[in-house]
Every structure is written in C-alpha cells, then in structure tokens.
C-alpha cells in the first residue's frame, strides 16, 4: 500500500512516464486540442467516436493520467473520512463498468463474437486486457490494481448469459481487498444499453443526476459523459445502481452482504439487460 512521500512521487512519476510513452509512440502529430477536467469523481474519459489516430492516442494519454489520479485518490494516505472512501468506491465501480464496456466494444469492432474470443481476452488478466484495448501504458497502470478475472456461465442456452467475475487481490492499491464484482450480460447487452434515442447526453436531466447524490455533478461532467457513451438512455439507472453500491462499500460490514442492481429493458420489462453485484469472495 502507498503511505510515504516517496510512494506518492512514484505514482505521479509513473503517470507522467506512461502518458509520455503513449504520446511518443502513438500520436501522429497533428493539431488536436482537448480539455479534460479531473474532479473528485475521476473516471476514464474518451471521445465517443474518435476522428483519427492522433485524437485516439491523445485520449488514451488522458486515460492514463486520470487512471493514476484514481489510484492516488484511493491510497490510504489520501483518505479523509467516509466521504473520501465513498469517492474511491464510486471511482472504482465506474472504472470496472467502463473497462467492461470497452471490452465488449473492442470485441465487436474486431469481429470477435464467440465466447472463446471473450474468454481469451479475459484470460489475459485485467491489466493486460486493458492494455490490449487502450494501450500498454494504460495496462501497466491497471496492473497495480491486482485484479483477477474469469468468465462464468450461470445459465445454458443459445444466447446464454455470461458473467465477468473480477476479484481484488491482497496486493491491490484499491482498498477493497477480497471484493468480487460480478457483471452479468448477454451478447446483445451493449447494443441494447447504448442506444441513444435522442443522440445527445443533453437529454439527461441534471436534476435527476443530482438527486442520486451527485449534487455537484451535472450531465456535462466527464464521469456522466463517459457512462453515457456506454449506457445511453439507461445512464440514470446505472448511476443509481453505482451510487447504491458505493454507499454499501462505505459500511464496515460490506463483506457479509451481497449487494447489487439490475437494469431492466424498457421495451421488455421482464428482460434484464445488465446486472452488477459486489460481495466478499468468501460468499462465493
């Protein structure tokens, strides 16, 4: 775990080196301008539809810096009471869902549609998997989280549901050791969730976002914008579930409970598009 001033310096130095590495090796120098705001609710941000390789690489460098900022916020020496720990939990859940969403997008874009393809990616390990999607520099930062993962199949069928199970190890910089996160979905989940009826994040009501506990976050903030890229018109439901889980992890007895949320289809109320549960590995 990180406690000393030397450790803090190491984290920031690694963020700088990895971001410069991506820029030096990936960016075809063109005129690209971007604005990024790092807030307490830090998340991985990227343009929904990058226009060129330079923009993609620049967004990847931003991902690295913000990922390291996330790690820095979660380190014990940065804790300042329950609010700080809740912020860390919120960041962590958003990050896991973002990584899962981009995994599915990566598989779709590369026409890797079989369960075997997904199992191969998951089998790489969390850090290496993220590195394959975003770049090696980002993957190295994620390796510090010491997360093991596997794909499980709770139900049989032609379009059977799959669950990505991710468990935090003892050496993780994330302070929720032995925490397992179970994200269950089917092959059509991402397309169903990311459908944008109105094509713009502006359709999200800022009041609805604030009512979930994000009083200082508008629908234009990076965390909400990134989630909207993946979850579209279902972003409010997902944010509500994330808030519930973050609150649960802030309690000392979270290890003894299984908590989660489900996103139901609006077109087919009996159909679950996505479910997310978090619990101690001892409950497996």
UniProtKB/Swiss-Prot annotation:
Cellular-component GO terms for this entry: fungal-type vacuole; plasma membrane; prospore membrane
Subcellular location: Cell membrane
Membrane topology designation: Single-pass membrane protein
Coiled-coil segments on the chain, per record: none
Topology Cytoplasmic: residue spans: 25-84
Residues spanning the signal sequence: 1-24
Keyword Phosphoprotein: no
Family: To yeast YNL033w.
Full protein name: Uncharacterized membrane protein YNL019C
Organism per entry: Saccharomyces cerevisiae (strain ATCC 204508 / S288c) (Baker's yeast)
């Amino acid at each position: 775990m990180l406690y000393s001033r030397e450790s803090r310096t190491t984290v920031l130095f690694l963020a700088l080196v990895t971001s410069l590495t991506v820029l030096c090796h990936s960016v075809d120098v063109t005129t690209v301008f971007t604005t990024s705001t790092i807030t307490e609710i830090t998340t991985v941000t990227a343009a929904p539809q990058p226009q060129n390789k330079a923009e993609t690489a620049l967004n990847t460098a931003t991902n690295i810096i913000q990922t390291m900022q996330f790690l820095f916020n979660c380190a014990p020496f940065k804790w300042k009471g329950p609010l700080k720990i809740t912020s860390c939990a919120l960041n962590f859940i958003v990050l896991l869902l973002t990584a899962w969403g981009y995994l599915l997008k990566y598989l779709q874009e590369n026409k890797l549609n079989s369960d075997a393809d997904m199992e191969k990616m998951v089998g790489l390990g969390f850090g290496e998997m993220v590195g394959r999607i975003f770049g090696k520099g980002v993957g190295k930062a994620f390796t510090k989280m010491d997360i093991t993962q596997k794909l499980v199949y709770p139900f049989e069928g032609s379009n059977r549901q799959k669950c990505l199970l991710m468990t935090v190890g003892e050496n993780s910089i994330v302070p929720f050791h032995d925490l397992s996160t179970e994200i269950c979905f089917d092959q059509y989940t991402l397309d169903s969730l990311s459908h944008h009826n109105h094509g713009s994040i502006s359709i999200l009501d800022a009041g609805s976002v604030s009512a979930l506990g994000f009083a200082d976050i508008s629908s234009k903030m990076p965390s909400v914008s990134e989630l909207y890229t993946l979850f579209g018109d279902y972003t409010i439901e997902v944010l509500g579930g994330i808030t519930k889980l973050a609150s649960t992890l802030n309690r000392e007895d979270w290890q003894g409970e299984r908590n989660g949320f489900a996103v139901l289809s609006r077109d087919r109320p009996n159909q679950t598009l996505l479910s997310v549960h978090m619990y101690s590995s001892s409950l497996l």
